[in-house]
């Protein structure tokens, strides 16, 4: 068998998934900041959804906004963790990253926080 390999120019566009770990951090920093932040081009995932859910539980206002890249999500976040006295339940789903990142943040709320999850 003879095989002939001929060089050919290569081209195209490749959309590489964003780092989920950096996405968590971006959302958390925006939630901690006073005022409005726009976090763009985060790869959609259940873990990111869990982080948004818990940050909302802590008082951040998070709105999904249209993204220009397919498979990505952008968020408009009105930051500021709200202190209170009412106990809250933070559902981390199956996201270990959400749990690890947000346990310390729960202390800032001044509330009793119960963390829940599913899966492994």
List the predicted regions and their residue ranges.
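Short, structured segments at the rim of ligand-binding sites
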Residues: 1-120
């Amino acid at each position: 068998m003879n095989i002939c390999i001929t060089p050919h120019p290569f081209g195209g566009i490749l959309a590489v998934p964003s780092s989920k770990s950096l996405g968590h951090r971006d959302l958390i920093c925006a939630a901690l900041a006073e005022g409005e932040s726009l976090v763009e081009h985060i790869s959609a995932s259940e873990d990111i959804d869990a982080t948004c859910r818990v940050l909302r539980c802590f008082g951040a206002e998070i709105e999904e906004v249209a993204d220009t890249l397919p498979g990505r999500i952008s968020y408009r976040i009105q930051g500021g963790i709200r202190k209170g006295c009412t106990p809250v339940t933070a559902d981390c789903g199956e996201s270990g990253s959400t749990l690890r990142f947000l346990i310390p943040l729960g202390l800032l709320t001044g509330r009793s926080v119960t963390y829940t999850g599913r899966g492994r």
